Amino acid sequence: MATLIPVNGGHPAASGQSSNVEATYEDMFKEITRKLYGEETGNGLHTLGTPVAQVATSGPTAVPEGEQRSFTNLQQLDRSAAPSIEYESSAAGASGNNVATTQANVIQQQQQQQQQAESGNSVVVTASSGATVVPAPSVAAVGGFKSEDHLSTAFGLAALMQNGFAAGQAGLLKAGEQQQRWAQDGSGLVAAAAAEPQLVQWTSGGKLQSYAHVNQQQQQQQQPHQSTPKSKKHRQEHAAELIYASPSTSANAAQNLAQSTPTSAPSNSSGGSTSSSGGGGGRKKAAQAAAAAAAANGVHIQKRYACTHCPYSTDRRDLYTRHENIHKDEKPFQCYACLKQFNRADHVKKHFLRMHRELQYDINKTRRHVSAGSGSSGSGSSGSGSHHSGGRGNVTINSAGVNIDNAFLEAQRHPTSSSMSIVETIEAVASATDMPLAQLKQEKMDDGAGVVLPLHVGVMQQPVASSSSGSSGSHGGNGNGGSGSGLLKPKREKRFTCCYCPWSGADKWGLKRHLNTHTKPFVCLLCDYKAARSERLATHVLKVHNKRACSKCSYLADTQEEYQAHMSDVHGNVGNANGGGGAVTIYTTTTNEGVAGGGGGGGGGISGNISGGGPLQEIIVNPSSMVGWRLSANGSLIPPHDLLTGGLPNAATQKRGSERLFQYLEAEGSDPEDYARLLKMDAISRNTASVAQDFHKAGGVHELKIPANHQLLFNNKLPSQWTTREAAALLYSLSNMGGGSASSVSGSQRQKFGMRARQHSTGEDDENTPSSASSSSFSGDEFNMSATSPLKLSRHAIKLEKMDEMDAKDMGPTKAMMATAFLEAANYEQTAIELLASKRKIKVENDNDEDQENQQHQPHQQHHSQQQQQQRLQLIKSSPAYKLNNNNNNNSNNNNYYKDKTSHRNAVHHHRQDDKENNKTKSPGTAAVSVAAAAATSPPSISGPSNQTPFLTQMEYQNLNRIGTQFQNYVKDIINKYYAAETPLMLAAAAAALPTATTTGQQQQPELDIENLSPSKRRRLLSETEEYIEYLRNKEDITLTIAPKVQPPAPVTSLLKRQLDLSTPRRSPKKAAPAHSNSASNASRKSLNQLATLLPLLADAASQQEYLAAPLDFSKKSSSRKQAQPKKIRLTPEAVVTLLRDKYLNRMVRQRLGCLKCNQLRKNSSISFNYHTLGSLALHKYWRHGRLGSSSTRREKLQAALQKRISRGQADKC
């Protein structure tokens, strides 16, 4: 639509003026003038005495000097493809149609002007015939059209569009002040150069939140005339800035905003008042750009409509009015099918389309009304305070203006039994009194007793129970009765189907609701009951277990009296509590019993005092009201931390059974659209991992109990959670220490926590270590070493060494030697890596000459390696709650790992060939270390006080010590199968050291003499073992699963030592794993490729045997109840068709029951069907080979008929 604004052509001083308000409200005026003037004509609509913009094919593209811009030329200039515009000096050339249309528009504008004058607009602006803008404080009636009437009418119509009715005295900006300011700007003031931002405050005087200028500094400087820029971008830069402040804005903030003059904020920073010509998307982008620009300059833009009950604010009145219903006491909408009440109309529609698909939805029946008497009395008593809480723009109709029958009102105050209180619509009242509907809606009386009727009309639907009685007489046969609403709705396409059953639904919400009937996510923690609905679970708990759960805390009452006493005592005044500082406000919803609820927040808190009833549903809860619960940023409730990130939490701090039941009970609010409740239930009940863990802790699965001070012994993991790196460390320690027993408690604990601290400091164990939330903490300073560096660890070891020296007289020299070994173990890993690198350089030679040469040099090499190895004692950690088979133990000191590893497949003992020789050459320091190691590997002494106390008791590891010899034999069978004769010692030791039943220290097996092995074979086994260790170092994706079978617990007498000194990053280059080779099983030498397959075989074998299931691993965030996915069939379509045919036809037909004649003709026909029942076979023979003739006879008949048709066609053509 294009419309002109009056131009002051005869006055150069006033020509080309740029109004700030015009530039700001230009887009809004387009819509206003389109509704005011209607459709445009060929040359555009214009008023009398104003120039007309004509569209021409050529001419200047900019606005000529002395002319003022209009909506037409601005719209044309913004479009690159639009033609140029020419201007006429007068309106004499206008056509007769334009004049007639203009006169009609003048009459319409005058009527609108009169309505505004009657409604309280005391200022009317007039102008002379020359179209000069002159402020006129008094009313001067002029017969012709006033050039300023367009702008004043636009202001009134703008208020009418924004608020739904005409504005009063406070509703419009004073036209005199505005025109006076325009007159001062007549010299061509440029807005971007000298205009200050105008702070427009929207007051809360009524439904129309009128705006008034707060900026008192209206001094404007006179500057030379400049033409208005032709592009919208430049117009925004030259336009003045309007800043809107809500009523809640303080005076200081308003003054600061008025004094601040940011230059980069665009002119459309008024939020929702200005709208782009591109539609809704353009308006959103403009508002976002304005908000971003204002935020960048430190200007906070307030929305026009701000809720006094919550922080909600908006620029749209319809959204604000809809939001008001949330805080209202009553629910003005209801479902006319089931009479369920709602506070928003869109909620009714959503409910209706979900639950009553077979009925026809009618929005006119969703409005719920109370009786006229109670409604009028309530509205009258509320007074002006009902403006904010009413929610809908109510029109007060004076009783003198509308003659409503008193009998009709009396009938509504006393409804009959067949119909509830039915209020006639405004349209019906208007038609009955012969009053125009438009005038009835726009009429607004300030005082006088009247009847308040809602502007949004509707008819109360009768109850379903009385629908059979038909509509009452007041309906007048308009079909609004319950029986008339039962029209069947055409069924929509069902696009959502269940994967478990043939169910199908129309929306995703119904599918999710239906899937709960299969998954049953609501689990009773007191028994094995599972429910698909939370309310069914609550009913089950009440009826079966006779418990009543509080929805606000973890209290469970046995009787209703105890529950009510608890609610009154504990939660009785929770709504009236006043919070201090930034306390969180408690908002309540639903009203049934009249219980007052609310809360005040001092400082930054927001107060709210809303009438509530029944069990108060908390939307935003103070965290102190629910112990252990947390409040998220969006207001939803987060359940207590359940330690879902792994580890074994301390059971003493976990609630069990019925105390956790309240987490799964649904709140008792009747509103299904209570989004806070849905968020709460989603955070509690839908958390499947939490449900699985709570069920596990409530007694569903036997849980392993490990003391807090012993959890680091396992790396916070069970054997089923070990990676190959940890498994390699276990094999490494088992091969080093063939036999072991429990040492002193303090020494093993120091070594254990020292190694764990080093792993935390290097960060290598983070991939399999649970989060810090689930890790155990220790009160003593001796154990708080989980984040220390190796330097601090060494200092701590020195401190422990000094402490041990003080007790050396009582404890003996063993403890001091272990402390020294612990101190030297910090530098062990680097040396071990160097040894591995040096050993990899040794090539295996199979020639006899090289073997003899190696035999000559071997004593020297062994001696050199022993000197390096004996200087450091390997760090020993206690084994993970199971014991090495003591049949594999020996009493010799086995500190050398690389030189004395020789093995047979059944030989799992460590033997030193040159023990005596090496012991003679030891230095004093090395001898002390060796004595310490020998003491660690010796059998326990009954008289020794340190050996009498085991590190771990029987009760602590009762579930991990139930391991018998069955699994050990099974693993040995696998090793014998794949490694017949020459299994390396590392693997043999690992197989023998796998968890077995506990044996006494005196049970020992006679040692096997393995000295007869040649040095070349011994060196070869050593090389293979080192390569396998390195492979385990580099391999991260294989997990060793050791799932022991349940065995009766056995007494604990000795423990193995294991080391975990493999966490430091390797400095040697990684060796790529070689490809798998299919070598024969009877080969003399087993390659590394075969060795690498042992670990996956062990894991697979353990999983197939179904030994003791590992406890739940809560470090995995994935849900334990996943929806069943359809199986993927990787077959060709023909094969799939064949499988489906065989699957379903085989159920009802007999195999090999086919037609003999068809089988004989199979060679000629590519398609044959051999699956028949007795009935189908009889029918087939009758129709196929019966009296109608054989297939050949019918074929001949068909061919003859075809030939006849062809001949007839040819004859017709001829």
Swiss-Prot record:
One of its GO terms (molecular function) is DNA-binding transcription repressor activity, RNA polymerase II-specific. SMART domains: ZnF_C2H2 (SM00355). Residues 258-276, 855-871, 885-896, 923-946, 1071-1084 have a biased composition (Low complexity). Expressed in the PNS and CNS. In early blastoderm stages, it is ubiquitously expressed, then, before stage 5, it disappears from the poles of the embryo and faint stripes are visible. At stage 5, it also accumulates in the dorsal region, cephalic furrow ectodermal patches between the tracheal pits, where neurons of the PNS appear. In older embryos (stage 15) a strong expression is mostly restricted to the central nervous system (CNS) and PNS. In PNS, the pattern suggests that expression occur in many of the neurons of the ventral, lateral and dorsal clusters of neurons. Residues 473-485 have a biased composition (Gly residues). One of its GO terms (biological process) is embryonic development via the syncytial blastoderm. Its main location: nucleus. Keywords: Activator, DNA-binding, Metal-binding, Nucleus, Repeat, Transcription, Transcription regulation, Zinc, Zinc-finger. Residues 1-20, 213-238, 250-284, 367-397, 463-488, 741-790, 848-946, 1062-1084 are annotated as: Disordered. Induction: Up-regulated by ac/sc in proneural clusters of the wing disk. It comes from the Eukaryota. The keyword rRNA-binding does not apply. Signal peptide: none annotated. It is found in: Nucleus. The keyword Protein biosynthesis does not apply. GO terms for cellular component: nucleus. A zinc finger (C2H2-type) spans 305-327, 333-356, 496-518, 522-545. Probable transcription factor involved in the development of the adult pattern of macrochaetae. Required for accumulation of achaete (ac) and scute (sc) in proneural clusters. Probably acts by binding to the proneural cluster-specific enhancers of the ac/sc complex and increasing enhancer efficiency, thereby acting as a stimulator of ac/sc expression in proneural clusters. Also required for correct development of the embryonic/larval peripheral nervous system (PNS). This is Protein charlatan. It comes from Drosophila melanogaster (Fruit fly). The gene is chn.
